[in-house]
């Protein structure tokens, strides 16, 4: 009987041997592998490129939305110039001058980008709701703004991953400052929704451009440290 | 027993295990993840293929893990994408991280894990086919073409640039098998040219993102190209028709003129155009016949206006034997004359023997006799005057001077060297007034010319023979138009090749026929055919006896010979106011001595002194006995 049991176990083992190898072993990732690749993670360069591309897209779409809104709701030029000083993200410790940007480290670049992104998620949602209340808001404008808000969230995720990869930092808690930027940044004279929305759009456009610039600078620094500006 | 039972059990176990795979319940087999696809880079779906379920109801579950995170999530949506699929929506899809996906099959007896798969969403994008593919037929200057337009799949966000798609379309005729592929890039419209008139086309479009897979082909669009006529084709048809007509007309014209063309392109080879030349004779090889056939019957011309002024009497010229023989063969009328004379000719080289006085005399007599015969025979060819001249000649012969070397030639006999003849001096005492000096001269000239123009032709001589009947007769002056005695002095010398005869001066004035038989013929001129035109001279040397004597000098000229240029050299004898030289035969002439220098006179007396230099044939022979000596040559100039 002992032999029989041993034989049985052996037979079972033989029959079930493929299952023993069920757990996969992660293989080394290669850059060029396509579908069903066995790479455990996306490489850093690839990730950075994607983030930059993402940021570019967001900027482009925001620019289109802004110009669309301008043409429709802000006909007079003098009104367009008023929004320059009312951006809600003024208070953020984001470098704004070229000198500052050149001196800042990679880490701070990334953190700045992340701050920007995170600070705009909420306002965009607000903007979306505001635009929905319009009577004559064009469909395209609404779609664009909606798209932008969605992509912004995605961008945030990407930047987080990027930070984790580049800086080997742990998962940063997405700290949405609920300080009510809107409440702080809204000028009293900007109660008019149109102007408010317009301000939001244009400010966001600027910040999106800033994000894109930071990321590109970061990339440039990755390849050639001393020639970037 | 126990051993056998164990063995049996083992065998049974093996059988069961073998059976288990097909029929008995068992844990499920390992499933396999077939593919994961994202249509717009915002969501994606994964499909798996389950293994055998082991006979028991088996459930499958998909678990995924995000990159560098140990948290295992289960598929949020098993139903949206259909059977054995897992759908990841927008919130669950991140382009920043890779996904590690595993499918697990579970049944009552166990579990089965599929091989895990790493997914990068960006690289698994396979868009939907393009939508709203429209094909229209458009026209471009009469040539139709297809315009294909489409839209990207509605899910792909190409507007914002989230996905960049490139398109490709394919076209084929309905009856064809192979497709024609066209890459359209990022544009959403494409033109297709070079269509077949009346053909039915099938068009399909597909797209692909930057990194990803080609989509499926869109649904086929059908289009029929309307029939159109090639404008170019009609032009070509017109051109072809016109050119065919033109070509046919040209061919017809060529056909009508083919003979002319043949003459133009391939001109016929000219044959020999010698009058009387018979090719057949040449082929037969009888040269004699050929040459005889070439004899021009009417040559020298019987009448010539140039000679009308002359009254010519007979001239007798000796001819060489061989020539006589040839002459015999000639078909002319003169042949009869020739033949009659053949016996009397002596054609040895030393013609001088013939020319000796005695011989001449003898010959003259014979000739005279023969002449009579020939006269009779040739009567049709002679005028009465000629006959009379001949009679006179006979008389003259009787009175031949010793000092006179005269060669009397019987009629019909021409004495010639190759193409040279010298007329015999005639002594004629009979008045020759009535002789037609012109006629004589004519005859002389004619015969001369005959010799001259056809050197070596005996026929010529034969021709001349008849004319050369030196039948000067002074007795028949009336026969001659100008009543001038014809003084003819012809020196016929066998040794002398004299192509022309110098002036023959007819002694002026009547002479006693018995004593002065010299007749002078004046060479009127030589025409371009080397014809010596003789004119009986009636002039100052008419003294009967003086013509042949030195005193006649001024009017005489002696044929001295012929120079190398075939020029008849005449020696002017003596002088006289009348500067017509005449050829005189002096018996006392020494060979080679010119009594007088020839007076080259370019002026012509109206009486018709003609100096001619006539080309003489090649042979030169010195004369003997005072005949014209080639050694001393005096050239005469034509008037």
UniProtKB/Swiss-Prot annotation, chain A:
Subcellular location as annotated: Secreted
GO biological process: animal organ development; growth hormone receptor signaling pathway; positive regulation of growth; positive regulation of receptor signaling pathway via JAK-STAT; response to nutrient levels
Any one Gene Ontology molecular-function term assigned to this protein's record: growth hormone receptor binding
Disulfide pattern: 29-39, 87-203, 220-228
Glycosylation sites noted in the Swiss-Prot or TrEMBL record: 143, 175
Similarity comment: family membership: Belongs to the somatotropin/prolactin family.
Full protein name: Somatolactin
Lineage, uppermost ranks: Eukaryota, Metazoa, Chordata, Craniata, Vertebrata
